[in-house]
C-alpha cells in the first residue's frame, strides 16, 4: 500500500493527488489518502475522497508519497517517526529546501 499525503491547501481539489492515485492504482498498487494539515478543516477535502490518518496505516505502507511543500514533508515525517518506510516528496511549495 502507498499512502498519498497531500497538503489540500496546495493541491486544491486534490487534482494531483487523484492523478497520482490513478497512476499508482493502474500499476497495481493499493493507495490511501492521508491528508496533512486537514484535521481541523475538513471542508478542504472533497466529499468524494475517503481519507484516514497516516498513523493508522503507516506500518502497512511500502512508501509514503507526500504532495506539498517543505512543511508538509516535515509534518508527515514527524508522524512517521520510528516507522521504517521511505518517503517521496513532490514539491508544490515555494521554498523547496527539501
Whereabouts are the PLM-identified features?
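Generic N-terminal amphipathic, Lys/Arg-enriched alpha-helix
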Residues: 1-9
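Small-residue-rich beta-alpha loop regions that form the catalytic core of phosphotransfer
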Residues: 9-13, 37-39, 49-98
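Short internal beta-strands
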Residues: 29-37
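N-terminal basic/disordered segments at the start of proteins
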Residues: 15-17
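A short, Lys/Arg-enriched amphipathic alpha-helix followed by its capping loop at the start of a domain
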Residues: 19-29
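An N-terminal domain-cap segment
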Residues: 43-45
Amino acid at each position: 500500500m502507498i499512502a498519498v499525503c497531500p497538503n489540500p491547501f496546495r493541491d486544491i481539489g486534490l487534482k494531483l493527488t487523484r492523478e497520482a492515485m490513478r497512476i499508482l492504482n493502474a500499476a497495481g498498487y493499493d493507495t490511501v489518502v492521508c491528508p496533512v494539515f486537514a484535521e481541523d478543516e475538513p471542508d478542504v477535502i472533497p466529499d468524494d475522497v475517503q481519507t484516514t490518518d497516516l498513523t493508522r496505516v503507516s506500518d502497512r505502507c511500502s512508501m509514503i508519497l507526500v504532495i506539498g511543500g517543505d512543511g508538509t514533508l516535515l509534518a508527515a515525517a514527524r508522524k512517521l517517526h520510528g516507522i521504517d518506510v521511505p518517503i517521496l516528496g513532490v514539491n508544490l511549495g515555494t521554498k523547496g529546501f527539501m
